[in-house]
């Protein structure tokens, strides 16, 4: 089992369009952001991990920021993420999240994101076989370029912002969000 990440092109669009500088679920092998959180701080901390997203991100409560969240596709983890995002969207500082989760319509995390009216917008469904990730087992890759992995199931791409996030990183016509969606598609 390994953890996949978005392509560097998709992350570059997140960074240029919405100022994404934090990655909530990554590893030293698949991170795109300089500041990232991972599950194994005991080993990943040597490579820059800030620890668990669930316990250390609160240090940014006075600063805010723009985050990319692609959690392990496990409902319990996604529910914890939902609770943390919900709390962070209540901060008084600008907060933006670009989130990728499986298209599991009946699961509470997906339902909550679909139901957002005050802090969520620009919801996109990405079809199976219609989006790519970079495989998380790069250490085994003997090629020079990353191995792209085509998803085997549908996923949803969400943009969630509080009022400060909307003011700092506006996207009235969803052009910037659509560019991120485009970068997930198979080239």
Predicted regions and their residues:
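Class I S-adenosyl-L-methionine
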Residues: 1-69, 73-187
């Amino acid at each position: 089992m390994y953890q996949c990440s978005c392509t560097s092109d998709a992350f570059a669009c997140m960074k240029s369009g919405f100022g994404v500088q934090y990655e909530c679920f990554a590893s030293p092998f698949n991170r795109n952001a300089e500041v990232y959180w991972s599950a194994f701080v005991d080993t990943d901390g040597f490579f820059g991990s800030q620890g668990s997203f669930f316990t250390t991100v609160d240090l940014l409560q006075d600063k805010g920021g723009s985050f990319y969240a692609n959690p392990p596709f496990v409902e319990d983890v996604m529910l914890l993420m939902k609770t943390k995002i919900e709390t962070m969207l209540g901060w008084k500082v600008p907060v933006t999240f670009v989130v990728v989760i499986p298209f599991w319509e009946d699961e509470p995390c997906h339902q909550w994101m679909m139901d957002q009216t005050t802090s969520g917008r620009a919801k996109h469904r990405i079809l199976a076989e219609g989006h790519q990730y970079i495989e998380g087992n790069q250490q085994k890759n003997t090629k020079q370029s990353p191995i792209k992995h085509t998803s085997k199931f549908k996923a949803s791409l969400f943009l969630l912002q509080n009022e400060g996030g909307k003011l700092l990183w506006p996207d009235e016509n969803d052009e910037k969000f659509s560019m991120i969606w485009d970068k997930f598609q198979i080239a």
